[in-house]
Amino acid sequence: MDYASVAMAAAPTTTTTTNVSLRRQRHRKEKLLVLMGATGTGKSRLSIDLAAHFPLEVINSDKMQVYKGLDITTNKISVPDRGGVPHHLLGEVDPARGELTPADFRSLAGKAVSEITGRRKLPVLVGGSNSFIHALLVDRFDSSGPGVFEEGSHSVVSSELRYDCCFLWVDVSVKVLTDYLAKRVDDMLELGMFDELAEFYSPEDEDHDEDSATRTGLRKAIGVPEFDRYFEKFRPGDVEGEDPGRDRVRRGAFEEAVRAIKENTCHLAKRQIGKILRLKGAGWDLRRLDATESFRAAMTSDSGEKCTEIWEKQVLEPSVKIVSRFLDE
């Protein structure tokens, strides 16, 4: 699927008015707020919190969440939790049309940035897929060679950006984040992730190899390869309505899949942090917000009030000040 041509064909034919509220003049770059961080660090929460202070719209930059389907497995923010804030490129791409590449994302997200700015709103890029973030933001993007984050790539991260960016990096200590991510997987299972994956499973698919590098699109999502191995042994249709942990063998296979999901999610978070540090080292002006204490409170306190209080003081309030200064520049 040529997503770039689709975006070009759908592009508006009229020139949008200057966004006075964002202090953007014709000769200046469009302003863009970028919320970065490893998976599970609260980027979506922060975007919704900031919407109470600024007129904004969200552009998703999570490469699994762009696809339709597997809403629980890919941890998409639910419609009620969006609080009426418009979201773009979230569950919009049909996975049957092929994999969305960084070049495709650059085209589609770039169009969204212009449209949001034209509505006198602040575009906010939210997601942990740093290859998509890099593709959208750099002034010159080469899609002909290996990506800047691909193994064996000698590409250099560019510090020349095509937008006037404000970067907020939501960070959580690895130990606390690891514990939280394990709990999040358990919560996702309670919400119905197992049933969602059972419905998604197709024995006719040829890419059941657990190595995500051999998979494409939505089939790369953490949870799919891990449970494919389970469903190969215990077909969903053969055990419909039964408890997946009914007997010892099945329970062992189920627990192994869950363990692998937790482990791979933590590995993903560590890789994402490494990429963020690489962007920072290349000169990207990332403002780090330490959310560790709010996450620790969420894991240890029975009341959400303490967690919310810490989050607002250590993450939200500093973010509001930073964004306010950014918009006044």
Swiss-Prot record:
Q: From the UniProt record, which GO molecular function terms apply? A: AMP dimethylallyltransferase activity; ATP binding; ATP/ADP dimethylallyltransferase activity; tRNA dimethylallyltransferase activity
Family matches, as Gene3D superfamilies? Crystal structure of tRNA isopentenylpyrophosphate transferase (bh2366) domain (1.10.287.890), P-loop containing nucleotide triphosphate hydrolases (3.40.50.300)
Summarize how pH affects activity.
Optimum pH is 6.0-9.0.
Q: Which Pfam families match?
A: IPPT
Q: Which cofactor does it need?
A: Mg(2+)
ATP-binding as a keyword?
Answer: yes
Q: Which residues bind ATP?
A: 37-44, 63, 74, 129-131, 220-222, 313
Q: In which tissues is it expressed?
A: Expressed in roots, stems, leaves and cones.
User: What family, per the record?
Assistant: Belongs to the IPP transferase family.
- Quote the protein name from its UniProt record: Adenylate isopentenyltransferase
Organism of origin is Humulus lupulus
